[in-house]
Amino acid sequence: MQKSYSLQELATQIGATVRGNADVVVENIAPLDKAQSNQLTFISNVKFRALLKDSKAGILVVSEEDVEHCSPESNLLIVKDPYVAYAILAQYMDSTPKAAQGIAKSAVIFDGVLLGENVSIGANAVIEEGVVLGDNVIIGANCFVGKNTKIGSGTQLWANVTVYHNVEIGANCLIQSGTVIGSDGFGYANDRGRWIKIPQVGQVIIGNNVEIGANTCIDRGALDATIIEDNVIIDNLCQIAHNVHIGTGTAVAGGVIMAGSLTVGRYCLIGGASVINGHMEICDKVTITGMGMVMRPITEPGVYSSGIPLQTNKEWRKTAALTLGIDGINKRLKALEKKIS
């Protein structure tokens, strides 16, 4: 049966000021331009204010500045930040199917595993010896958890996650399907053309409240640990190489590649498809815009960009030609400066 939520109930969740019928109910959340009378919507960008007046939504989440753009008949939740309010309400109204409770008959649990209370382990999952799973941990179907790994309370691994041996994952983490944690780092020595593999004997240590997207790889350290601190969020298809250290509260968008022994500070924002060199540091509160190529340390907080924004092919060819000719132009300018002086 579809659950419904009243205006007043939702206002309590986000500390909102109410305008309209406190008893009106909605069932779910929809985009501003599509929401119907049984749905809640929100506005987080002023360029969409023109849509407010004719919105059919049962409830609108708006800021004080948005109110005058709404119909007098609209039921409003008035808040300081509608987008944050939306995030809180989306959690409260979340209808994502829950994982099956209990331990599946086909799960393989080795001797010496310590299970907390209310642990759930899905079909065909393998939990090797020495593993410690905290209270309310959820291990999805077909997951593998290697020897002596520790997973903190309330953490969930969706189906088909692989966690190698000696990994530590904190409490209340969420790891999406296909992610691999603790695989070997890319460590080799070259002996006259022959690659000699260096065993990767370090760990991966992940803090609390960390979320990791689907099909991301986090390599174990060569000697010391690869470290992901508390409250880090990492999107899909990222490569985190051995001995990377990511600071508290940093967000990493999809497709990012971080080379080995990189240190990323706290509260950084790393744009999608960025590539960051290893063996260097990025300070706290740095934003790297999408497709950034970072080859040197960053020592000052701020926003950094690289790359060429999209152009027509004709414009891009001109830009490329000019770029290739910069050295010659520079030499001619220096020659002119020398003559003038």
Swiss-Prot record:
Q: Which SUPFAM superfamilies match?
A: Trimeric LpxA-like enzymes
List, from the UniProt record, the residues annotated as the active site of this protein: H242
Is this entry keyworded Hydrolase?
Answer: no
- Which controlled-vocabulary keywords does the entry list? Acyltransferase, Lipid A biosynthesis, Lipid biosynthesis, Lipid metabolism, Repeat, Transferase
Entry GO CC: membrane
Q: Which reaction does it catalyse?
A: a UDP-3-O-[(3R)-3-hydroxyacyl]-alpha-D-glucosamine + a (3R)-hydroxyacyl-[ACP] = a UDP-2-N,3-O-bis[(3R)-3-hydroxyacyl]-alpha-D-glucosamine + holo-[ACP] + H(+)
Taxonomically, which superkingdom? Bacteria
Which Gene Ontology molecular-function terms are recorded?
Answer: N-acyltransferase activity
Q: Quote the CDD domains the UniProt record gives.
A: LbH_LpxD
Gene3D superfamilies assigned to the protein according to its UniProt record, in alphabetical order:
1.20.5.170, Hexapeptide repeat proteins, MurE/MurF, N-terminal domain
Q: What is its EC number?
A: 2.3.1.191
Q: How does it assemble?
A: Homotrimer.
Family membership noted in the UniProt record: Belongs to the transferase hexapeptide repeat family. LpxD subfamily.
Protein name per its UniProtKB record: UDP-3-O-acylglucosamine N-acyltransferase
Gene name linked to the record:
lpxD
